[in-house]
UniProtKB/Swiss-Prot annotation:
Skewed-composition ranges (Polar residues): 9-23
Function: Prefoldin subunit; part of the gene cluster that mediates the biosynthesis of elsinochromes, pigments consisting of at least four interconvertible tautomers (A, B, C and D) that have a core phenolic quinone to which various side chains are attached and which play an important role in fungal pathogenesis. The non-reducing polyketide synthase PKS1 was proposed to iteratively catalyze decarboxylation between acetyl-CoA and malonyl-CoA subunits for polyketide chain elongation.
Annotated SUPFAM superfamilies: Prefoldin
Entry similarity comment: Belongs to the prefoldin subunit alpha family.
UniProt keyword terms in alphabetical order: Chaperone
A molecular function GO annotation: tubulin binding
Protein source organism: Elsinoe fawcettii
Protein name per the record: Prefoldin subunit 3
Subunit structure: Heterohexamer of two PFD-alpha type and four PFD-beta type subunits.
Assigned GO CC terms: cytoplasm; prefoldin complex
Domain of life, per lineage: Eukaryota
Length: 197
């Protein structure tokens, strides 16, 4: 894929060695300005079209994975924000000696009443069935870091999705140009043979 991505046009100059990929390593699709740069005869058309089709499939696979990752982050960010808000609430109650009365969810429609004493540590689920105790201030610091990383990752996913859609469109246009060039060449060949008879 990278060998085809090194070509360019006056509108889209050939990427330099440093810009053949986006910041996360996804390669640029080749921009076909002149079909003759890719295809020299009608015998090359099939292999070129197959190559473009394979690249489109790869970009679509990357797009699908990025969409899944983005959806996961969109679910995860509100959970982190909710947990962070609770940790900050508990941090604000450190000086209060009275226990907090609360209701917590046992099931979708079943809640239990509890008295939560003032605490200096919280337990956080880290994933993969791992829970660790943290002092409240360290838990807040950890959650702020995780929230920032998740938001950055979501922004990167959104950028990558836009980039991938652009590359898929570029390849679809390239495929159409090569196909149309082939049709034109075959028509010229038929007209040339028909004129000689």
């Amino acid at each position: 894929m990278a060998s085809l991505a090194l070509r360019g046009s006056s509108e889209n100059p050939a990427p330099t060695k440093d810009t053949t990929t986006n910041p996360r390593g996804i390669p640029y699709a080749p921009f076909v300005d002149r079909v003759e740069d890719y295809v020299t005869s009608t015998t090359d058309v099939e292999s070129t079209l197959k190559s473009f089709s394979e690249m489109i499939s790869k970009y679509q696979f990357m797009e699908s994975n990025t969409q899944r990752r983005s959806a996961g982050l969109k679910d995860k960010i509100p959970e982190i924000q909710k947990t962070l808000a609770m940790v900050r609430f508990l941090a604000g109650r450190e000086e209060d000696d009275e226990p907090l009365e609360t209701h917590f969810e046992l099931n979708d429609t079943l809640y239990a009443k509890a008295l939560v004493p003032t605490t200096k540590e919280v337990y956080l689920w880290l994933g993969a069935n791992v829970m660790l105790a943290y002092p409240v201030d360290e838990a807040e610091e950890l959650l702020v870091g995780k929230l920032g990383a998740a938001k950055t990752s979501l922004e990167n996913c959104d950028e990558d999705l836009d980039f991938l859609r652009e590359q898929i469109t570029t390849l679809e246009v390239a495929t159409a140009r090569v196909y149309n060039w082939d049709v034109g060449q075959r028509r010229k060949e038929r007209e040339g043979k028909g004129g000689k008879s």
